[in-house]
C-alpha cells in the first residue's frame, strides 16, 4: 500500500521511500523517512496534491509522489497528547556557569576585526523579523553573484564591526535548490565568524534537522528559539539548559515579534564569534544505535577523507555525512582518487547492508532519531495552539472542495479592484496630478526665463512627460505589493499553490506560479518581481517568460480606443476575447517551453503549510519600502535613458534640425524602415509602426501617439480596416512589454533573456496577427 491510498484521518507507518535524485532527497530532508508515522489530513479541492502530517507538522505533496512512498500498519489517528500549562523555565544569562563560554580569557579576536554572522533558518520561522530587530534600518538588499536569490546584509544595532547576512530560508543543506546551494556556499566560502540559527519553537522537530547540519560545519553558533511566547501561551515550554547540554551550543529563547530576548541573543552571538567557540557536539550517531552501522560508516569516512577535507577547507564531519548521503558536489571538491572512491563506496554499502536502509535514508533516519531524543528530553508539548485551531477552521473554507476556488477568485478580484480601481488608482491619480502641476510650473518658469527651445523640449516633453508617466505607476505597484505581502505573510499564498497545483501542472508549471501570473494582469513589473518566491529555477524562468502574455492594465487604453472606434457594439466581447487570447497564448507557450527549453525532472511539490498569522505592520512597511526603492532604482534609470532617446528621435531630423512635422523626424524615418514588416498584417502605415515603437516605452503612449499623428478617430478609421484593427489589437496584446518590464526581466534573468523576450514576443505577435488576418479573410470579415 502507498501513501496515495491512505484514507483521510488515518495514520500509517512509512516503510519505503521511493524515487531518486532530488525528489527522494527532498522527501527525506522533509522528514518522510522509513519508520515515521504519517497521517492523511486532506486532499486539495481538485484531488491533488494532498496534505499529510508527519513529525507533528503538515506537508503537501502530489499524488504521483505519494505513490512512491510505501506504508503499512494503517490505523486511526492517535489523539495528540495534551501538555499542562507550565511556567516559563528560566534560562541562564551570558556566561552563567561558564559552560559554553569557558574561553572568556583566551585569545579573543582583535576588536578591529569584523564579526560576520550568517542568519540561517527554515522558511516561515520569523527570520526576517529577527533580522529587522537585529539591524533596524541599516539593512540593504544585495545579490549573490550569478544567482538571483536576494540576501540582506546589516549591522547589528549598537555593535560596531558587526555584519549579519540574512540567508535564504531553507530546510536542509542538500544541494538541490538554489537557496540551499547559496546558503551552503556562503558559509563554506565566505567563512562567517558565527552562525545565528533561528528555530521555530512551535515546530522544533522540523527545524532542528537544519540545525544539526549547520553544527556539522564547525562554525561558532548560537540557536535562537523563536516564538517562545506562543509556546508558553499554549501551555508548553522548553528545558533550555538541557537542550544546550544535548546540542553543545548556546540556546536562547526569544520572541522576535515582541523584541524579547534579542539583547541576550546578541551577547551570546558576539561572544561565540569573538572567542571562536565552536559547537561542542558534532557527532549525532550513537555507537549503540541500530548496531552502530551509521556510526562506523561516518567515522570510517572521516578517517578516509580527513586530509582531503582539510585541503579543500571543508569541515570533515560535514563532508563525511554529505558523502554518506551521496553528495556529488562535495565528492568533486574533495578530489578523491579512484582507490579512495572505491573504499568510500565499500564503507557505504557495508553500512546499507547492516542498517537495512539505503545511504540517504540511513543518514536522515540518524538525524531524526537524534532530534526525537532531544525533543523527548527537553520539549514539553503544548496544547494544540490557537493558531493551529484557527488555521484548521479557516482552511475548511479557503481550501474546501467547493469553496476554495470561489474564495481565491473573490480574494484576488478584491485585491485587483482595490489596487487598480480604488486605492492604487486614487494614489496614482494624485501623484499624476502632482507631476502634471510640477511639469506646468517648470514649463512656465523655463518659458519665462527664455530657456533654449531644445533644452526646454528635452526637460518638459522628454524627461517630465516620459519619466512622469511611468513614475505615476509607483503607487499602484506599492499598493499591489501591500496586499500581496498581506496574503504571503498570512500564509494564504501557500494555500493558493496547494489549491491550483493540479491545474497548472497540466501546462508544465507548479501551483506556486499562479500568483506572479495573476499579478501580471495588473502590471508585468511586479509580476516578474513576484516570481522570486518560486523555489525552482525552471519554474521561475518559465513564469517570468509567460507573465508578459497576461494582458497588463496599461494595455486597456489601447483596447478601449480601438473597440470604441471600430467595434462600439461589441466592445465588451472584444475585450474579453483579448484577455482570453493572452491566457490561451500563455498556455500554448508553456506547453512548448515544457517540451523544448525547459525539459527535465520536475521539482517535487513538497511544501510546509504554515499556520495563518497576522503580518507585522513593521515588516510589511519595510517590504513596501524595499519594493518601491527597488522599482525606482531598476526601472527609473532605464526609463530615464529611454525617454531621452525617444525624445531625441521624435524631435530632430537626420540633419539634427528641430522638426515641425513629426513625419520628418528620425523616429518617422526609422519607423518607415519598420513599416513594411507590418504591411502583410494590414497596418503598414509608418504612423502605426511609430506608435508601436513608442509603446515599447509605455503601452499607454500607443494611443497618445496615434492621436497626435492622425488628429482624429475618423482619419484613423479611413486608413485602417476592421480586420486590420483586429490584427493590430492582437499584435498589441502579444508584442514586447514596456521598457520597465524588460528592465525587470533583465534584472532577474540577465540581458540575453531580456533580449530574447523582446524579439521572441514580437515574432509571436506577428505570427498570431498574421493568422488572425488569414482566418478573417477566409471567413469574409
Provide a role label for each language-model segment:
Residues 553-576, 740-750, 771-781:
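Transmembrane helix-loop junctions at the membrane interface of multipass transporters and ion channels
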Residues 91-172:
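Conserved G1/Walker A P-loop phosphate-binding module
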Residues 433, 437-441, 494-524, 599-623, ...:
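Juxtamembrane inter-helical linkers in multi-pass membrane proteins
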Residues 407-418, 480-485, 563-565, 578-592, ...:
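Hydrophobic core segments of alpha-helical transmembrane domains in multi-pass membrane transport
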Residues 159, 182-251, 558:
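Conserved C-terminal guanine-recognition region of P-loop GTPase G domains, centered on the G4
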Residues 231-286:
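Canonical P-loop GTPase G-domain recognition
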Residues 354, 361-365, 381, 422-463, ...:
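Extended, low-charge hydrophobic alpha-helical regions
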Residues 248, 275, 281-449, 658, ...:
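Extended helical scaffolds that flank P-loop GTPase cores
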Amino acid at each position: 500500500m502507498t501513501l496515495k491510498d491512505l484514507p483521510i484521518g488515518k495514520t500509517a507507518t512509512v516503510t519505503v521511500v521511493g524515487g531518486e535524485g532530488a525528489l527522494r532527497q527532498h522527501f527525506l530532508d522533509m522528514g518522510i523517512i522509513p519508520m515515521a508515522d504519517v497521517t492523511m489530513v486532506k486532499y486539495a479541492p481538485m484531488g491533488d496534491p494532498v496534505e499529510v502530517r508527519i513529525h507533528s507538522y503538515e506537508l503537501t505533496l502530489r499524488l504521483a509522489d505519494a505513490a512512491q512512498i510505501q506504508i503499512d500498519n494503517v490505523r486511526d489517528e492517535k489523539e495528540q497528547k495534551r501538555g499542562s500549562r507550565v511556567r516559563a523555565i528560566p534560562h541562564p544569562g551570558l556566561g552563567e556557569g561558564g559552560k559554553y563560554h569557558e574561553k572568556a580569557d583566551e585569545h579573543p579576536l582583535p576588536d578591529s576585526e569584523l564579526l560576520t554572522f550568517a542568519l540561517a533558518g527554515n522558511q516561515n520561522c520569523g527570520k526576517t523579523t529577527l533580522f529587522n530587530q537585529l539591524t533596524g534600518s541599516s539593512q540593504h538588499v544585495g545579490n549573490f553573484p550569478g544567482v538571483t536569490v536576494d540576501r540582506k546584509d546589516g549591522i547589528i544595532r549598537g555593535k560596531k564591526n558587526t555584519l549579519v547576512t540574512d540567508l535564504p530560508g531553507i530546510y536542509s543543506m542538500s544541494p538541490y535548490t538554489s537557496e540551499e546551494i547559496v546558503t551552503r556556499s556562503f558559509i563554506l566560502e565566505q567563512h562567517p565568524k558565527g552562525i545565528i540559527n533561528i528555530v521555530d519553537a512551535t515546530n522544533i522537530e522540523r527545524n532542528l534537522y537544519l540545525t544539526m547540519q549547520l553544527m556539522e560545519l564547525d562554525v561558532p553558533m548560537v540557536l535562537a528559539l523563536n516564538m517562545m511566547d506562543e509556546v508558553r501561551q499554549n501551555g508548553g515550554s522548553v528545558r533550555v539548559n538541557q537542550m544546550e547540554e544535548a546540542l553543545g551550543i548556546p540556546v536562547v529563547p526569544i520572541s522576535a515579534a515582541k523584541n524579547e530576548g534579542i539583547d541576550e541573543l546578541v551577547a551570546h552571538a558576539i561572544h561565540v564569534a569573538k572567542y571562536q567557540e565552536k559547537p561542542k557536539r558534532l557527532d549525532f550517531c550513537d555507537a549503540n544505535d541500530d548496531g552502530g552501522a551509521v556510526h562506523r560508516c561516518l567515522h570510517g569516512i572521516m578517517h578516509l577523507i580527513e586530509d582531503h577535507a582539510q585541503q579543500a577547507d571543508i569541515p570533515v564531519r560535514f563532508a563525511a555525512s554529505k558523502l554518506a548521503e551521496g553528495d556529488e558536489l562535495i565528492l568533486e571538491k574533495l578530489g578523491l582518487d579512484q582507490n579512495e572512491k572505491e573504499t568510500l563506496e565499500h564503507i557505504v554499502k557495508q553500512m546499507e547492508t547492516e542498517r537495512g536502509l539505503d545511504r540517504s535514508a540511513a543518514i536522515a533516519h540518524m538525524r531524526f532519531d537524534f532530534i526525537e531524543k532531544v525533543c523527548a528530553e527537553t520539549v514539553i508539548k503544548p496544547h494544540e495552539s490557537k493558531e493551529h485551531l484557527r488555521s484548521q477552521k479557516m482552511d475548511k473554507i479557503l481550501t474546501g472542495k467547493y469553496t476554495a476556488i470561489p474564495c481565491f477568485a473573490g480574494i484576488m478580484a478584491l485585491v485587483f479592484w482595490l489596487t487598480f480601481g480604488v486605492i492604487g488608482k486614487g494614489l496614482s491619480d494624485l501623484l499624476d496630478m502632482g507631476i502634471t502641476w510640477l511639469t506646468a510650473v517648470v514649463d512656465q518658469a523655463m518659458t519665462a526665463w527664455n530657456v533654449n527651445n531644445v533644452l526646454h523640449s528635452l526637460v518638459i516633453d522628454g524627461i517630465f512627460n516620459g519619466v512622469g508617466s511611468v513614475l505615476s505607476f509607483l503607487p499602484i505597484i506599492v499598493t499591489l505589493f501591500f496586499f500581496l505581502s498581506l496574503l504571503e505573510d498570512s500564509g494564504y499564498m501557500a494555500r493558493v499553490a496547494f489549491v491550483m497545483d493540479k491545474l497548472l501542472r497540466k501546462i508544465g508549471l507548479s501551483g506556486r506560479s499562479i500568483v506572479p501570473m495573476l499579478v501580471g494582469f495588473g502590471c508585468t513589473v511586479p509580476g516578474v518581481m513576484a516570481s522570486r518566491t518560486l523555489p525552482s529555477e525552471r519554474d521561475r524562468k518559465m513564469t517570468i517568460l509567460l507573465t508578459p502574455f497576461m494582458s497588463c492594465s496599461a494595455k486597456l487604453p489601447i483596447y478601449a480606443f480601438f473597440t470604441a472606434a471600430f467595434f462600439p457594439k461589441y466592445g465588451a466581447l472584444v475585450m474579453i476575447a483579448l484577455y482570453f487570447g493572452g491566457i490561451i497564448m500563455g498556455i500554448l507557450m508553456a506547453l512548448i517551453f515544457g517540451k523544448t527549453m525547459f525539459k527535465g525532472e520536475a521539482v517535487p511539490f513538497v511544501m510546509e503549510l504554515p499556520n495563518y498569522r497576522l503580518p507585522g505592520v513593521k515588516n510589511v512597511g519595510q517590504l513596501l519600502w524595499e519594493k518601491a526603492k527597488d522599482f525606482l532604482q531598476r526601472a527609473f534609470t532605464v526609463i530615464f535613458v529611454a525617454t531621452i532617446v525617444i525624445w531625441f528621435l521624435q524631435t530632430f531630423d537626420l540633419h539634427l534640425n528641430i522638426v515641425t512635422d513629426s513625419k520628418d523626424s528620425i523616429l518617422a524615418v526609422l519607423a518607415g524602415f519598420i513599416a513594411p514588416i507590418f504591411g502583410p498584417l494590414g497596418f503598414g502605415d509608418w504612423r502605426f509602426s511609430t506608435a508601436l515603437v513608442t509603446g515599447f516605452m509605455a503601452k499607454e503612449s500607443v494611443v497618445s501617439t496615434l492621436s497626435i499623428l492622425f488628429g482624429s478617430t475618423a482619419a484613423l478609421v479611413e486608413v485602417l480596416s476592421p480586420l486590420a484593427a483586429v490584427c493590430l489589437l492582437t499584435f498589441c496584446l502579444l508584442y514586447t512589454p514596456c521598457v520597465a518590464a524588460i528592465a525587470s526581466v533583465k534584472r532577474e534573468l540577465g540581458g540575453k533573456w531580456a533580449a530574447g523576450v523582446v524579439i521572441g514576443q514580437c515574432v509571436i505577435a506577428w505570427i498570431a496577427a498574421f493568422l488572425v488576418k488569414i482566418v478573417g479573410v477566409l471567413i469574409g470579415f
